[in-house]
Amino acid sequence: DYHYFSFEVDWIIIKTDAVFYIIHGDPGENGFLAEILEKNHIPQTGCDNYVSKLTFNKKKFIEFVDNLEIPCAKQILLKKKETIDIERILETIKPPCIVKPNNGGSSIGVSKVNYIDELEKKIKIAFNEDNQVLIETFLEGQEVSVGVIDRNGKRIILPITEIISENELFDYNAKYLGESQEITPANISKQSEELIHKYIAEIYDNIELNGITRSEFIIVNQIPH
């Protein structure tokens, strides 16, 4: 029974002692499993359901990060039940821009839009993956990824990795089909490295991230976003 994380063997109910979950996306990263485990007082690896829900929802997490005064791309949120109003979108964001599902991972449904006449088509592609779509200004710069391990209350920031995609953006093919290069340590300035460490510390301290996490930044003029 997934509601209680128990199962039956030879008429005996086996209860779960602890859960080490590595499920990518829904229902692992979005807080669904974490909430069930917490309600049943079952220890688990990773973040609690509140943190998982916050970080999985791109718009909510951007708002949280923006309140910490960490630079972010300008964005606008669309909902599937609403009419796609291209003129209203263009009042806030113009191509080049990125269109992505608001909830989800692995860059599925993510597109770069270079021209206005592509915008509606790319929005519909993203809506195939989620009921909410986020449109962001395109940031031209170095893309980097950094892992963090929280072990026994000690935060360990791993070396920063630079990501060089063979495609227009770090899309699904670049992530999983080898169409990218990953360089560790990243070829970035000391200023950028220090800012990334600072931003990670601020995020960790304000939402109590724990376990193993990975954050991605795009560095524009030495400033990570």
Where are these regions (language model features)?
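ATP-binding N-terminal substructure of ATP-dependent carboxylate-amine bond-forming enzymes
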Residues: 1-50, 55-56, 60, 79-88
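Short glycine-/acidic-enriched loop or helix-start segments at secondary-structure transitions
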Residues: 30-32, 108-109, 145, 216
